Amino acid sequence: MYNIQDHVVIITGSSSGIGLAASTLALASGAKVFGIDISNSPTSVTANPNYTFFAADLSHPESAKKAIAACIAAYGNRIDGLLNIAGVMDLNQSADTVTDDMWDRCIAINLTAPVKLMREVIPIMRLRGKGSIVNVGSKASMSGAVSGIAYTASKHGLVGATKNVAWRFKHEGIRCNIVCPGGVAATGIRDGVDSTQFDSEALEMMSVIHQAHASDHAKGLGLQPEDLAHSLLYFLSDLSKGISGAVIPVDNAWSTI
């Protein structure tokens, strides 16, 4: 399906939502997938001999280093692709209400962990003279009107990190892009979020933006994790050769407002 036969691909957030859909599609395309998640290994892919699972809390400082060491132990000193999908939401907390814990967790998982994983895989990709990294952003990567300050800052930061990596390693065969989904059903990103704790005033301010996109689902036009998986695999593969440093909305035109 995609030209990634026998490629070693690391996928974070692999146990649910977009991460699981991407893992399933990558395996179907012949890749060897190293899945990372804080949740249990997904039963739908665990039995596949080309799937290796590593349990990790990406907010821990050493998790990226340990994960890549485990990947090398499983598949050797080869990493062709990295999909940084794992992420956490905030509670729409504003600059005047955000807690230290919420800020620290969003930055740690949504920004610091992807950067640390890139730091670990890029030297391996440089040795091979080739590699592809796809980070997953959000509508909040390009707007200040859809989420809280912690999530928004983390996703804006990931855009900057993506562009920096793309330019720095453009002559070494390493590409880096960021796909920004919006309005995807059942992503798992809200798991563990207590909806009763949302900043109601901030949520009300942003409701007009949310409602504009919610109409897609009512009309049967909402995106599913599998839709995002195809976009991610396209940009991971050589089908998108020459595309690097790009910020790609996959949100059925939500990014136009």
UniProtKB/Swiss-Prot annotation:
Keywords: Glycoprotein, Membrane, NADP, Oxidoreductase, Transmembrane, Transmembrane helix. It comes from the Eukaryota. It catalyses: protoaustinoid A + A = protoaustinoid B + AH2. Pathway: Secondary metabolite biosynthesis; terpenoid biosynthesis. InterPro entries: NAD(P)-bd_dom_sf, SDR_fam, SDR_superfamily_enzyme. NADP(+) binds at residues 11, 57, 119, 151, 155, 184. The chain crosses the membrane at residues 7-29. Glycans are attached at residues 50, 92, 110. GO terms for biological process: paraherquonin biosynthetic process. GO terms for molecular function: oxidoreductase activity. The active site is at residues 151, 155. Its main location: membrane. It is a single-pass membrane protein. It is an enzyme of class 1 (oxidoreductase). It is found in: Membrane. The keyword Signal does not apply. Its EC number is 1.1.1.-. GO terms for cellular component: membrane. Short chain dehydrogenase; part of the gene cluster that mediates the biosynthesis of paraherquonin, a meroterpenoid with a unique, highly congested hexacyclic molecular architecture. The first step of the pathway is the synthesis of 3,5-dimethylorsellinic acid (DMOA) by the polyketide synthase prhL. Belongs to the short-chain dehydrogenases/reductases (SDR) family. This is Short chain dehydrogenase prhI. It comes from Penicillium brasilianum.
